[in-house]
Amino acid sequence: MTSKTKNIDDIPPEIKEEMIQLYHDLPGIENEYKLIDKIGEGTFSSVYKAKDITGKITKKFASHFWNYGSNYVALKKIYVTSSPQRIYNELNLLYIMTGSSRVAPLCDAKRVRDQVIAVLPYYPHEEFRTFYRDLPIKGIKKYIWELLRALKFVHSKGIIHRDIKPTNFLFNLELGRGVLVDFGLAEAQMDYKSMISSQNDYDNYANTNHDGGYSMRNHEQFCPCIMRNQYSPNSHNQTPPMVTIQNGKVVHLNNVNGVDLTKGYPKNETRRIKRANRAGTRGFRAPEVLMKCGAQSTKIDIWSVGVILLSLLGRRFPMFQSLDDADSLLELCTIFGWKELRKCAALHGLGFEASGLIWDKPNGYSNGLKEFVYDLLNKECTIGTFPEYSVAFETFGFLQQELHDRMSIEPQLPDPKTNMDAVDAYELKKYQEEIWSDHYWCFQVLEQCFEMDPQKRSSAEDLLKTPFFNELNENTYLLDGESTDEDDVVSSSEADLLDKDVLLISE
């Protein structure tokens, strides 16, 4: 999707037919919106660019329209194959999320029988594939800052997006603004820690349902990672309640009553089936999702941010291309090593074995993510795929000195060209120092995003406080500390709309 509008003659006939059919399926919509073109398509929906004929939407949600005076909106047609609950969930979350300039709000929703559309602002932006190889470190900083600001707002509502990826974060390079879209897979985060605050609570949680009987679902959602805080070094119980499988039965050690799980499972199955929400896009899913952790949190979105940042620094997209969960874990092994993956698996009560690998580094890259990115860039520099003016050489130069010359955060940079005057030489040296510092702190953020333990992985709010974003944060607050950012500001007209105008499908 870009800011350019196609000529009607350039629109393919099949797209024209789709738009005519949409008018037919939703009678009366032609009086409010004029369809312009189809701008996107996914598994569960299609998105069309349209003109807001009445001006009602563009007026009430003016802060969300980046081009002043724009009257374009996006109509998202949700396919009838989507379950009613899924449709309700997405519309309801969009409704709840209204209030941030970095999250696309639900402006309107219409339903005729099984046909449902959601009306959102139209955001002119550039496709990620067109700029990820050329975005300088300052642009990378702004991109990730905008994304983390959006996630900070979403996570503050207790919502997990679950599908963070470049196509769901629309970024306008000229304006330096981004917006998070597509809440089709989003869900509320469960408060597992309050559900299981002690060993006795664990017994009740694992073995009973709301009616006082056994709940299979509770066992499927339980993950040993929830109980780690109960077994800290200061705790009297140094060994967590292990679970073993014997003849189709789950036996909880430490004098916890066993529960027969034979019913509903294969008769001779000796392994407890582990179920968890694995929704998301391959290549962007966190280890706990791949390992079917039942206690997933907003931290899975932070891992996805790390994948995007890795693509920007390594100038490669997509970064991971595995077709299944097992291959996804092996891809992580090549970077972090199978020993790290084994530790991660143990957090979730799993074992992890990897044999016959061509890449046989149990500890992964010795210098971690810096060495991995250096390896990616070095290969491209060797074969000459970067143009001579590429900003990738700034990252490559930083890593070259960081890994091989072992320079400090304030390196002795090369002297500027001798034919420069003193002012130009000073400005160049200052620029070089800023670039070096930005890269140093950027890799700190990257490492925090890729923390294997979700409880230790930084939140969006924590990442925004890192030195990497200092210069952007300074522009966000007044001297007295009052926020000047529009992120949490809702106009009075938008607030009124929340109460009056948008009617959602009832559960």
Curated annotation (Swiss-Prot):
Coiled-coil residue windows: none
Organism lineage string: Eukaryota, Fungi, Dikarya, Ascomycota, Saccharomycotina
PANTHER family: CDC7 KINASE, ISOFORM A-RELATED, OVARIAN-SPECIFIC SERINE/THREONINE-PROTEIN KINASE LOK-RELATED
Its job: Serine/threonine-protein kinase. Needed for the initiation of DNA synthesis during mitosis as well as for synaptonemal complex formation and commitment to recombination during meiosis. Required for HTA1-HTB1 locus transcription repression.
Cofactor entry: Mg(2+)
Highest taxon of the lineage: Eukaryota
Primary gene name: CDC7
Name of the protein described by the UniProt record: Cell division control protein 7
This enzyme's EC code(s): 2.7.11.1
A Pfam family it matches: Pkinase
Membership in a protein family: Belongs to the protein kinase superfamily. Ser/Thr protein kinase family. CDC7 subfamily.
Catalytic function, reaction form: L-seryl-[protein] + ATP = O-phospho-L-seryl-[protein] + ADP + H(+); L-threonyl-[protein] + ATP = O-phospho-L-threonyl-[protein] + ADP + H(+)
